Amino acid sequence: MHAIQTEMDQLTHTINQHNIRYYVDDAPSIPDAEYDRLIKRLTELEGDYPQFKSVDSPTQRVGGIALQKFAQITHLKPMLSLDNAFEQADFAAFNKRITDKVDNVDYVCEPKLDGLAVSITYRFGVLERAATRGDGSVGEDITANVRTIRSIPLKLRGEGFPDLVEVRGEVFMPKAAFEVLNQRQISKGDKVFVNPRNAAAGSLRQLDSKITASRALGFYAYALGVVEGESQPMQTSHYGQLTQLQQWGVPVSSEVKVTDSLEKVYAYYADIMARRSALEYEIDGVVIKVNDIAKQQTLGFVAKAPRWAIAYKFPAQEEMTLLESVDFQVGRTGAVTPVARLKPIFVGGVTVSNATLHNADEIARLGVKIGDTVIIRRAGDVIPQIVAIVPEKRPDDAQDIIFPQHCPVCQSIVERLEGEAVARCSGGLFCEAQRKEAIKHFASRKALNIDGMGDKIVEQLIDKELVKTPADLFSLTASSVTMLDRMAMKSATNIVAAIKQAKTTTLARFLYSLGIREVGEATAANLAQHFTEFERIRTASVEQLLEVADVGDIVAKHIRQFFSQPHNIEVIDQLLEAGITWPVIEQADESQLSLKGQTWVLTGTLTQLNRNDAKAQLQALGAKVAGSVSKNTDCLVAGEAAGSKLAKAEELGVKVIDEQALMDLLNAAN
């Protein structure tokens, strides 16, 4: 081996060992100055001899070429959220649900870091890719930025790790680093960050990884994700798996503890809450998980969260401040929401100047007036709420909050339907506020999926009066789009081309794009499959709508009301005249509904067709496609990297087929 290569390999190994001692073992072994000298020498050698640069070189952490945009990554298995407990009774109820189903439960308690959840995949021990949580199914590719975080190993240490290891954890910004960053922002005249979480998220989502590298981000793993090609058995407990990750060089919080009783969980919670301000990072609660992996699989999942874990949040922090005025905002569905404008107050780690008052009933319940001193709480440390007034501080000139009878944006009549708390503008797409949100929704990924039509583009199109309804999008020309700020002809041409391409869609997507209240993707798909023709949907009675799966009385009334509004029908007719089309849906006769009455579940990664297509084809055969396995499930389709759903199906004796068997079934049916 070349002498220079030997020196470079030795430097790489030495620096990576120091990184492990500093970030994983919390036991730095050399002064910072000596560490900097080692990095400087390796950087110089790599510049002169790039052919000898190692894949796990620590110099990769300084950042590379800036990206134009983030690519999308589909997670190997969904990154679910957690249910919350806000008081001891909530956790006691969670514990009862657990102990009713499994015996001898140990819990792992972990600090709930206030950062950004990420997935990091190692293949053959080398960091291959990293992604944000995103919507749980699809995240953004942040591999280049994650490589710059010094506490994250570019290469796993030791041996015995599987061929593929997915590590899930939280990227955060330590409090001290946050203060330094904001001081730097102030000195440059730049905007400061509100809190460490925002700073971490903003730093991690930089298109230029050099910016990420310049900010001191940290990382702690909190779980294993997908594992493939194990050379030895994996640990059978959550705590054991975290220990295994540490042995491979992945940092795990030293605050993680195993408890064997409810009392010890409460003691852990009280202890870490008391030490919260002294920790080097922000936390907003404690995550509590069943330790035994087999018991986790027995307990399973609900739609978006595991049954075996919960986030036990800290009590919201409260402060008093002055309610100076109330504005009324109008949302996409016309909901008129009163927003309190407050004298700015620092509460729960951020400065709060606005808080929702929800609706007229809430204003009446609180008895609040303009000029009152109010108590602000950050519920779950996220959403500012007015929870009470301080009557003794009310001034003589306090003013009643008068709910508007006309929309503050378009002056249409504000209506409040019987049985609903929310008042709504009746203006529909005539209302500019609804118009903006409606067009954003219309162009969104799950609706017509107009590539490049982001929120800021929509806002400019409306502000410049180029667009008033979704139908107007199809009249845009490249030259008119260039009127937008910083919009070159090439970009404008691409947007117009994307709009034209979006004319070909599906009936389900078109229905969803209209923004009918309570009509999400699933309901839109059910409506399309049931009626097969748009004209039948828009003329359907409430009684006919109630025949559709998952459509109840309230949703049926919302649909009927939407199609009874002349301005909505006018826009729909314009859209159809603009050339929006979709494939004809053939009404299957009863003999073709071979899966009618059956409940199917999909899990894992499908390689021959995407999950939405599989779901649609199963529904076309009469099946109901559910999100979780139960004793009522007739069949589970297990794709690659199938996880807990497969284990649950096997436990319950549910029929399991692979993707090829599904394809054979669908091909035979077609």
Swiss-Prot record:
The active site is at K112. It comes from the Bacteria. Keywords: DNA damage, DNA repair, DNA replication, Ligase, Magnesium, Manganese, Metal-binding, NAD, Zinc. GO terms for biological process: DNA repair; DNA replication. Gene3D superfamilies: 5' to 3' exonuclease, C-terminal subdomain, 6.20.10.30, BRCT domain, DNA ligase/mRNA capping enzyme, Helix hairpin bin, Nucleic acid-binding proteins. Zn(2+) binds at C407, C410, C425, C431. The keyword Cytoplasm does not apply. GO terms for molecular function: DNA ligase (NAD+) activity; metal ion binding. Its cofactor is Mg(2+); Mn(2+). It catalyses: NAD(+) + (deoxyribonucleotide)n-3'-hydroxyl + 5'-phospho-(deoxyribonucleotide)m = (deoxyribonucleotide)n+m + AMP + beta-nicotinamide D-nucleotide. GO terms for cellular component: cytosol. Residues 590-670 form the BRCT domain. The keyword DNA damage applies. Its EC number is 6.5.1.2. DNA ligase that catalyzes the formation of phosphodiester linkages between 5'-phosphoryl and 3'-hydroxyl groups in double-stranded DNA using NAD as a coenzyme and as the energy source for the reaction. It is essential for DNA replication and repair of damaged DNA. Belongs to the NAD-dependent DNA ligase family. LigA subfamily. This is DNA ligase. The lineage of its organism: Bacteria, Pseudomonadati, Pseudomonadota, Gammaproteobacteria, Alteromonadales. The gene is ligA.
